[in-house]
Amino acid sequence: FDVKGKKYINTPAKYYFEDVGLRNARLNFRQQEENHIMENIIYIELRSRGYRVDVGVVEVYETSNSGKREKKLLEIDFIANKGDKKYYIQSAFEMTSPEKIVQEKKSLTKLNDFFKKIIVVKDDIKPNTDEQGIITVGIFDFLLNDNILEQI
């Protein structure tokens, strides 16, 4: 979903399994990347709470090291919609370096609307909001509190 253009675009599809165990069996237990599994679990949880879920894309223009202006497409893991509520959600297994923090927040900072922008991390942290209005919440709070999106 093109967030700025507010239309569906042709981008590579992402697939999520309703049962992570079936996902693992289908992949012959070869791919055990916790970050992919966490993203899949967030998707399942959003769907079980009644949200319509899309993958978002934000188009930005940046100047490369060579001085050329280049178009880049930044992904937003989930755009969760239910009624008049919309949330932009990034799944970030770890944000252990300043570079990783910038990477995870970049697509969210390019959005110019008032909907909540949330990063779900593996760590058990107290929900917090940064100076850009981006909320970071731990996966356990996200999964165990059905109303977390409204409360943060």
Stretches found by the model and what they are:
Residues 46, 77, 89, 108, ...:
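Hydrophobic, well-ordered secondary-structure elements that form the walls
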Residues 52, 116, 133-135:
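Conserved beta-strand segments of alpha/beta enzyme cores
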Residues 124-152:
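Domain-level recognition of nuclease-like catalytic cores that cleave nucleotide substrates
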Residues 121:
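Short beta-strand/turn micro-motifs composed of small residues
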Residues 77, 81-97, 104:
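Active-site ExK catalytic segment of metal-dependent nucleases
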